[in-house]
Amino acid sequence: MFPRRLDSPAAYGIAQAMMDGFDRHYRLFRAESARAKHRFETSDWSGQQRAQRERIEFYDLRVKECVRRLEKEFSAGAQPMDVWHQVKLHYIGLLVGHRQPELAETFFNSVTTKILHRTHFHNDFIFVRPAISTEYLENDEPGARPTYRAYYPTPESLQETLVRVVDNFQLQGEFEDLARDAGRVAEVMRPRLGPAKWRANFQIQVLSSLFYRNKGAYLVGKVINGFQELAFALPILHGTDGRYVIDAALFGEDDLQMLFSFARAYFMVDMEIPSAYVQFLRSLMPRKPRAELYNALGLAKQGKTLFYRDFLHHLRYSSDRFRIAPGIKGMVMLVFDLPSFPFVFKVIKDYYPPQKDTTREQIKGKYLLVKQHDRVGRMADTLEYSEVAFPRERFEDDLIAEIEKFAPSQLEISDRDGDGNVEVILKHVYIERRMIPLNIYLQEAFDAGPHDARARQQMERSVVEYGNAIKDLVAANIFPGDMLWKNFGVTRNGKVVFYDYDEIEYLTDCHFRRVPAPRNEEDELSGEVWWAVGPRDVFPETFGPFLLGNDAVREVFMRHHADLLDPVFWQSHKERIQAGHMYDVFPYDPERRFGAGTGSPA
């Protein structure tokens, strides 16, 4: 029960200190995001990547700062629960009129759960459900920048309006030919709008901040005509002479889903009201969960909060049971899923086969590397949780036995809260979007037979995509380590994505070598490796026997990606990366580009 009176001075002080902590966090987060504009204008690509990586750490640092302050100034952990009841009510009062209330609620949860015992992790003490609506949040102060701007072109002035749209972002520097680029956009936009008459409400709505990532800046908006809405994004790059160009025009939900993919690095966006940006983006991509949109904007903790709420909602309205995930079992990770839920859950095992020379901390380090690195659309993002409780009755007994056998240190089965509900509590778990394992996807094509044209096309496309995925990883300075088909998955849009991270290394840390010539006949006939191998030595010529046992797969692979079996390919990329070169990886199909000769946004 909430108190009828707010009579604790300490409660208000704690609430205000937490609000101060959040405001400091978002001020620093927003300032770093806003600096992306200058880094883009000055072609500071290494600085952009470094900022993207470092910004991820901001949140946890501010939470730790706030916890230390609360303990030092208020002995927060020793305060009675009636004070903590009041803390939440005071905090809700401070949120009235706040422009990031949903983020501030999540920050409150992060701090409070570091101080209180988990028996108090319910809505009386933390924000299990949001308390403040984010609907129609605006900054009404004079001179405040709106979330989006609306433009009203005529059929004759479309090109001119597009020039004005881009000009309003006030990028420092020159375009090669903005009128030309706007004309190209208008030319491809008109067919997308179809033959319909331009209605009275025809307008172009554009978000007020550009979206920065790596070498690119993206203008994001939509065209409204009558009841029709057309989402679009325009990538702005530096051309070969350093001047700006609009490289492509992306239209529709599928193009934008690729741009905002869970397998890509987070954007830098200067947002005062992030919920308004998310609401606008949801109108462009209605199938994309809000959790993933917050993630894409760099607000990963809010993404985790929304994901967990969605997950609890799904549990309430489903009845199937968690099971061991289909497919080949991993040597390092124990994977399970809920068939009706489009994600998989991964637990690090307690022990591994001898060939896996690793530790739990090393594996966590690999997953952190992926979180902080540019994923170039080829590595799935992960959500990391601790002390996650599931209803015991929703687990198949085989799965419980599997966890007890391979990860007993991570498992607790108890009524820890004393509420009569027995739970499965996992100490540490990663959650990833479910994909079709590539080996299973290929097997489906093989099972259809060699004369099935669609199956043949599926096989060819996935083998080509597999090679493209590896090459994109190489461009991002990532060596996947274990390149077996089972460690890659196929997304809903047919993209091949890597998701097994326990053996990944920076490409620049590896040594790519040729297999030495046999010294004698005994070496030549030996089935064992007879030459000396260092800890990070890689022999690309040896990949073939593990990957290309199927003749049809071998033919397609050798036609498109034979260079992956040549050490020269790997070594040349390594040397160029060491020399400071950043490879170009596009988050959209090459045929969307207006012309060659520009750098990549990625």
Swiss-Prot record:
Enzyme Commission identifier(s): 2.7.11.5, 3.1.3.-
Record GO cellular component, one term: cytoplasm
GO BP annotations listed: glucose metabolic process; glyoxylate cycle; tricarboxylic acid cycle
Subcellular localization(s) per the UniProt record: Cytoplasm
Keyword Protein biosynthesis tagged: no
Superkingdom of this protein's organism: Bacteria
Reaction(s) this enzyme catalyzes, per UniProt: L-seryl-[isocitrate dehydrogenase] + ATP = O-phospho-L-seryl-[isocitrate dehydrogenase] + ADP + H(+)
A single GO molecular function term of this UniProt record: ATP binding
Keywords assigned: ATP-binding, Cytoplasm, Glyoxylate bypass, Hydrolase, Kinase, Nucleotide-binding, Protein phosphatase, Serine/threonine-protein kinase, Transferase, Tricarboxylic acid cycle
Alphabetized InterPro entries for the sequence: AceK_kinase, AceK_regulatory, Isocitrate_DH_AceK
Chain residues that bind ATP: 325-331, 346
Active site: residue positions: 381
Family: Belongs to the AceK family.
Role played: Bifunctional enzyme which can phosphorylate or dephosphorylate isocitrate dehydrogenase (IDH) on a specific serine residue. This is a regulatory mechanism which enables bacteria to bypass the Krebs cycle via the glyoxylate shunt in response to the source of carbon. When bacteria are grown on glucose, IDH is fully active and unphosphorylated, but when grown on acetate or ethanol, the activity of IDH declines drastically concomitant with its phosphorylation.
Protein name: Isocitrate dehydrogenase kinase/phosphatase
